[in-house]
């Protein structure tokens, strides 16, 4: 385990020599065209060019940031990732979204949902969010009359305007120095008490492009080789590897040869959901840097392996940076050359096309011609399947992070007619996660089945039937729960509730990361077999980290590099608060406590 002074010396040496390498560890994958779940072949990472940034900060911060920037390979044109700069806006963004808006249409019954779904399919509209109360849709202003003309009279006047000028919001969210302003009634950062800059880590000040994420992952592997590996879990259509952290450390003397109980956390299934990618990275950073300092986190990494995949859709994520900020699918070719891409969360093999997947490749929810038609889902499934067959992993938990709408969804997604056999456990943990989030930042997340849209009761049978604007079959959630028997499987839709949608401002990265990291700790507590009865919520409700006091649960790069006071570090490890509550009027819940 690196001591802070060791890390400082090593990274200073790195800075002056310009050399950092990390050899990917773990098992490789088969060629994506392989039709069978067979043995894997190793796959390596391509090298990245590294460039040094000019100093512009104080001496210690400059040294810290320069080391990181040199290792990550951030060129001068990309300094706006940490400090917004005057890069020109791609003209394609303006031409594509110049007249677009986002409408919220209220729905009241299954008939209205079905009518709206048909109109969306006819006009090839982009559904941003849908639930039992409303549907958020992106469309051009000139298409609004056509949409309303296809809807029943009951839906003619139930819409409200969420985003009036989408192209402007895209521009301001990517280039905040050019005048990005929060809505006056914005609630996305309320009750947090801090901004991303408080973390002191350059990486989480803003969203990061894929090459930077990859270099950052290599950096952490080189710093913490005792419990961190860099592995590949799949291959994309364009030939990129899908990188992941594998975290875990067996206690000394442990000779157990049983498969390691494993939790998998993924983000970025949909390319435009940048907050999901940043949140997976934040969770990984906390687990990695707290190992050996936080006894509960150390136990979690000793008892379980953790697979964290910032994005399972690197092709789409790169495209959302370079060409189209709101791109959703992967970049795989389809039967229509002008409509590429498959929706990765409709492409998994369990109950594929459960409720009539949109068959047109131009649909944002297009699931391909058959199950596992996408390169990414097929190769990830092969990797996960082989992990279980080779007795390397026993998947016990799965978190699939998305945005937006602040929901915690449990199986099944494809239908409400099938009740999951572990429903009681799923609901118990889901409500525990929701409570942890509420006590972290006072944000409310709704717990529900992933199948639920507008739920009605079928006459005669009494069965609950759900009607959705989007198809819900072929989800990663259902596949990991049913096929790999990951007992605690959830899809978590992150911030916000529609004010910004997929264009969530970057100052929400750290608050969102903290509340989901706390959720992971609750998940870990359940996996240790203690359920909800042992949770001590007092740690969340102001014990040592009330408003105005710095939360010590996040070890920043500043501390890793420059804090040489070992006694203070040991003391902070003993006295550490594992959850942050940063509002004076926190909930004073009784009963459970965490750890």
Curated annotation (Swiss-Prot):
It comes from the Eukaryota. Residues 206-527 form the Peptidase M14 domain. Zn(2+) binds at residues 270, 273, 402. Residues 23-178 form a propeptide. Binds 1 zinc ion per subunit. Glycans are attached at residue 386. Keywords: Cell wall biogenesis/degradation, Disulfide bond, Glycoprotein, Metal-binding, Secreted, Signal, Vacuole, Zinc. One of its GO terms (molecular function) is zinc ion binding. The keyword ATP-binding does not apply. Belongs to the peptidase M14 family. Inactive carboxypeptidase that may play a role in cell wall organization and biogenesis. This is Inactive metallocarboxypeptidase ecm14.
């Amino acid at each position: 385990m690196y001591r802070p002074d060791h890390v400082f010396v090593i990274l200073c040496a790195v800075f002056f020599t310009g050399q950092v390498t990390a050899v990917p560890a773990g098992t490789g994958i088969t060629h994506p065209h392989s039709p069978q779940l067979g043995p894997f072949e190793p796959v390596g990472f391509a090298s990245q060019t590294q460039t040094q940034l000019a100093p512009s900060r104080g001496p210690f911060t400059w040294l810290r940031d320069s080391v990181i920037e040199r290792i990550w390979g951030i060129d001068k044109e990309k300094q706006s990732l940490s400090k917004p700069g005057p890069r020109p806006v791609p003209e394609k963004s303006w031409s594509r979204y110049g007249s677009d808006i986002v409408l919220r249409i209220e729905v009241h019954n299954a008939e209205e949902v079905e009518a709206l779904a048909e109109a969306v399919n006819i006009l090839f509209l982009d559904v941003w969010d849908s639930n039992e109360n409303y549907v958020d849709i992106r469309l051009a202003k000139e298409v609004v009359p056509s949409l309303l003309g296809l809807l029943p009279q009951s839906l003619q006047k139930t819409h409200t305007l969420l985003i009036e000028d989408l192209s402007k919001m895209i521009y301001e969210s990517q280039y905040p120095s050019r005048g990005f302003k929060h809505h006056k009634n914005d609630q996305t950062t309320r009750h947090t008490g801090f901004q991303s800059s408080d973390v002191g880590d350059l990486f989480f000040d803003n969203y990061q492009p894929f090459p930077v994420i990859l270099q950052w992952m290599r950096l952490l592997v080189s710093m913490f080789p005792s419990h961190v590996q860099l592995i590949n879990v799949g291959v994309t259509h364009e030939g990129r590897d899908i990188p992941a952290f594998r975290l875990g450390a067996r206690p000394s003397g442990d000779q157990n040869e049983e498969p390691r109980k494993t939790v998998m956390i993924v983000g970025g299934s949909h390319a435009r959901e940048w907050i999901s990618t940043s949140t997976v990275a934040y969770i990984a950073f906390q687990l990695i840097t707290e190992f050996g300092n936080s006894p509960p986190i150390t136990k979690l990494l000793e008892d379980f392996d953790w697979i964290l995949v910032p994005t399972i859709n690197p092709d789409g994520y790169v495209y959302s940076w370079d060409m189209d900020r709101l791109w959703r699918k992967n970049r795989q070719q389809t039967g229509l050359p002008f409509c590429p891409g498959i929706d990765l969360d409709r492409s998994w093999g369990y109950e594929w096309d459960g409720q009539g997947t949109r068959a047109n490749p131009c649909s944002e929810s297009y699931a391909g011609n058959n199950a596992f038609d996408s390169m990414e889902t097929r190769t990830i499934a092969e990797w996960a399947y082989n992990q279980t067959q080779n007795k390397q992993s026993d998947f016990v938990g799965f978190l699939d992070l998305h945005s937006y709408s602040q929901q915690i969804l449990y199986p099944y997604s494809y239908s409400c007619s099938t009740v999951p056999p572990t429903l009681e456990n799923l609901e118990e943990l889901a409500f525990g996660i929701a409570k942890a989030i509420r006590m972290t930042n006072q944000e409310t997340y709704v717990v529900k089945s992933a199948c639920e849209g507008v739920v009605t009761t079928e006459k005669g049978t009494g069965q609950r039937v759900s009607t959705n604007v989007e198809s819900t079959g072929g989800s990663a959630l259902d596949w990991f729960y049913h096929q790999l028997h990951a007992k605690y499987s959830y899809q978590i839709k992150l911030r916000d509730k529609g004010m910004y949608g997929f264009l969530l401002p970057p100052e929400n990265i750290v608050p969102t990361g903290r509340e989901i990291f706390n959720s992971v700790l609750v998940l870990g507590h359940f996996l240790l077999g203690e359920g909800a009865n042992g949770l001590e919520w007092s740690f969340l409700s102001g014990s040592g980290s009330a408003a105005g006091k710095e939360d010590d649960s996040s070890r920043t790069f500043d501390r890793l590099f420059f804090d040489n006071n070992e006694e203070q570090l040991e003391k902070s490890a003993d006295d550490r608060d594992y959850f942050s509550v940063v509002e004076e009027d926190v909930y004073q819940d009784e009963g459970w406590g965490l750890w």
